[in-house]
């Protein structure tokens, strides 16, 4: 083949059919949704079951830390639960995209709701990470002391639940990008 033939667009005429690529994208979309369910549901369960009681107490006070002591953590649990529920409900639509890779309208709906759930998850994880930072470091100017020196198990669990949630955010970004690529190829 001459170099001039390539410049004229007479190169290899073989190409991958669009349906096959879209089917591969749809399978990857389904797998990413399953992994995201595990991350967000795990984060909600880890945060929702977090509590610790210190072994010492005064005559009137027992020192205890629970996730529902702070409204931000409650919002975090609710948001992760909503996102997990949405992901479970979106699995049939993802299966539909594997079977019918040219389904355009349902992909648009998924992009819209995936973006909304991404925003909700980002808001919850960001708010919770600010409180986790205060729990670890405190704020001397506001007279807020770090509690993680006393409540070690509590702080380890709330920090771990943030990891799953931020992993879910990254996977949601990939889901939106994959849906956009699949939509552009329809």
UniProtKB/Swiss-Prot annotation:
It is a multi-pass membrane protein. Residues 1-26, 96-107, 183-186 are cytoplasmic. Signal peptide: none annotated. InterPro entries: CASP/CASPL, CASP_dom, CASPL. Glycans are attached at residue 51. Its main location: membrane. It is found in: Cell membrane. Residues 48-74, 129-161 are extracellular. Keywords: Cell membrane, Cell wall biogenesis/degradation, Glycoprotein, Membrane, Transmembrane, Transmembrane helix. GO terms for biological process: cell wall modification; cell-cell junction assembly. The chain crosses the membrane at residues 27-47, 75-95, 108-128, 162-182. GO terms for cellular component: plasma membrane. It comes from the Eukaryota. PANTHER family: CASP-LIKE PROTEIN, CASP-LIKE PROTEIN 1U1. Regulates membrane-cell wall junctions and localized cell wall deposition. Required for establishment of the Casparian strip membrane domain (CSD) and the subsequent formation of Casparian strips, a cell wall modification of the root endodermis that determines an apoplastic barrier between the intraorganismal apoplasm and the extraorganismal apoplasm and prevents lateral diffusion. Homodimer and heterodimers. Belongs to the Casparian strip membrane proteins (CASP) family. This is Casparian strip membrane protein 3. It comes from Vitis vinifera.
């Amino acid at each position: 083949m001459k170099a001039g033939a390539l410049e004229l667009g007479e190169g290899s005429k073989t190409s991958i059919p669009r349906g096959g690529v879209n089917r591969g994208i749809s399978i990857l979309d389904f797998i990413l949704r399953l992994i995201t369910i595990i991350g967000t549901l795990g984060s909600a369960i880890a945060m929702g079951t977090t509590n610790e009681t210190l072994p010492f107490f005064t005559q009137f006070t027992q020192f205890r830390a629970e996730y529902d002591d702070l409204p931000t953590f409650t919002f975090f649990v609710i948001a992760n639960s909503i996102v997990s529920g949405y992901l479970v409900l979106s699995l049939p639509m993802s299966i539909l995209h594997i079977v019918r890779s040219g389904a355009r309208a349902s992909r648009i709906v998924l992009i819209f709701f995936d973006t909304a759930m991404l925003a909700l998850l980002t808001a919850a994880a960001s708010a919770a990470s600010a409180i986790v930072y205060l729990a670890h470091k405190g704020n001397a100017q506001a007279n807020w002391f770090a509690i993680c020196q006393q409540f070690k198990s509590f702080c380890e669990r709330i920090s771990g639940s943030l990891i799953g949630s931020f992993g879910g955010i990254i996977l949601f970004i990939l889901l939106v990008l994959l849906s956009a690529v699949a939509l552009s190829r329809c």
